[in-house]
Amino acid sequence: MNLEKLEVSHDADSLCVVIEISKHSNIKYELDKESGALMVDRVLYGAQNYPANYGFVPNTLGSDGDPVDALVLSDVAFQAGSVVKARLVGVLNMEDESGMDEKLIALPIDKIDPTHSYVKDIDDLSKHTLDKIKHFFETYKDLEPNKWVKVKGFENKESAIKVLEKAIKAYQG
C-alpha cells in the first residue's frame, strides 16, 4: 500500500483509518513504513482478541513516534489493510513501557455502517463496550516480558480532535 497516493482525510467526521488488525484477531500486525507490507508483529501472548478493528490515521505522528492509533468500533471485522472512513467519538489515554499512547475511538461513517449512527460522543457508547476496550488494553501485554500498560481513561470527541490536530502538526513538522 502506498500511503503517499492515498487521499487522506483528517476531517473528524470522515477520517481515513488504515486497518492493521481486524476485530476478534489475536495477531498483531503493523504496516512496514518502507515496503508498505502488512507485517506480523506477534501473536498475542494471552488468550485475548482485539475488541475492535485497530489501525492508524495516515500522515499523523502520535506521542509514541508512530502514526496515531485508532479503534474503529463496528459489529463487523474489516479486512486488515483496508481503509475505513470513520468519525471520531473519543480517545483512550494510556501509557506503556514506551510512554504515552493515545488511541482514537471512532465509528465507521454512516454510509459504511449505520448501526451506531446514534453515537455522537464517547458517553453514547455503552459502559460494557468501554469496559471491554479498557480491559483488553489493561491486560493484553500481561504475559509479555518487560511490557506493561496503564489505562488512564476515556475522553470525549473534543479531546480526540485535539489529539488528532496535534498528531497532524507533529507529522507536518
Curated annotation (Swiss-Prot):
Listed InterPro entries: Pyrophosphatase, Pyrophosphatase_sf
Binding sites annotated in the UniProt record for Mg(2+) 2: D69
Top-level taxon of origin: Bacteria
Class of the enzyme per the UniProt entry, highest EC level: hydrolase
UniProt: Mg(2+) 1 binding residues: D64, D69, D101
Record's protein name: Inorganic pyrophosphatase
Organism field: Helicobacter pylori (strain ATCC 700392 / 26695) (Campylobacter pylori)
UniProt gene name: ppa
Xref: NCBIfam families: PRK01250.1 (NF002317)
Gene Ontology process terms (BP): phosphate-containing compound metabolic process
Record Pfam families: Pyrophosphatase
Keywords of this entry: Cytoplasm, Hydrolase, Magnesium, Metal-binding
Binding partners and assembly: Homohexamer.
